[in-house]
Design a protein with these regions (language model features):
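Short glycine-centered segments of the SAM/dcSAM-binding site in methyltransferase folds
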Residues: 50, 147-148
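A short SAM/SAH-binding and catalytic strip from SAM-dependent methyltransferases
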Residues: 119-131
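C-terminal lobe and adjacent flexible extensions of AdoMet/dcAdoMet transferase-like proteins
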Residues: 214-223
């Protein structure tokens, strides 16, 4: 599986693009992050330990995870230095610098040891990964035994989706909402085959009003 299943293009994250993402995340998209953080905790049962937010951008989901789970430390991971700088400014402004760190890294080669993180989350970045198999292989490597992922895209609820899609289309009628894309049976089968290939036998795919989310589980005692 060499190509992204959504067949989307890799974005260019220069500082202008990173600042634009930051503005949207802190305004139009702001309500979704606490909801997604709560959904992630509910879906996985993970409330403590180390959480990685992959493709964190301006750090909004990372901050929501830290705010809703006081016993959890978080690392906001992004391949863009510009995004990491903006994320750190946001983290510091929120007074969360003792709970959240930033790290530069690509999902296809994560800068973490094996069995490292209890929870790995990501909202929206999966649609830009160039090789899903390599990415999920790395994610499963870094996931600690007993850990889970909550990776995908969505708005947390149907009400928030309707609100935000309407507002974004007001701003830009050509805006491409990835939430409009639906996964069919072939897509789901490809995911099942991919997870088997990386050695993950316990997983579930959530495809409902909260969005499209992949919950991988690494069995306790696995290496």
């Amino acid at each position: 599986m060499q190509k992204n299943w959504t067949q989307t293009k890799t974005p260019v994250f220069n500082r202008e693009a990173a600042l634009k993402m930051n503005e949207i995340a802190k305004t139009v998209f702001a309500p979704i992050y606490p909801v997604i953080a709560q959904n992630a905790r509910h879906a996985t049962g993970i409330n403590r330990g180390l959480c990685l937010d992959l493709g964190s951008g301006p750090g909004m989901l990372a901050m929501a995870m830290a705010s809703t789970a006081p016993d959890m430390s978080v690392v906001a991971v992004d391949s863009s230095e510009e995004s990491n700088e903006i994320a750190w400014e946001n983290i510091r402004d929120a007074g969360l610098e003792a709970r959240i760190k930033t790290a530069k890294g690509d999902v296809h080669g994560l800068p973490f040891p094996d069995n490292h993180a209890n929870l790995i989350v990501s909202r929206g970045s999966m649609f830009f990964w160039t090789d899903l198999l390599d990415a999920f292989k790395e994610i499963f490597r870094v996931l600690a035994p007993g850990g889970h992922t909550y990776i995908g895209g969505g708005f947390g609820s149907s009400a928030l989706k309707d609100l935000i899609v309407a507002e974004m289309l007001k701003r830009d009628p050509s805006w491409d909402c990835y939430a409009k894309k639906k996964s069919d049976a072939d897509d789901l089968k490809r995911f099942e085959e991919m997870f088997a290939a990386i050695g993950c036998s316990t997983f579930r795919i959530i495809n409902d009003e909260t969005g499209f989310w992949i919950v991988l589980s690494k069995t306790a005692g696995a290496e």
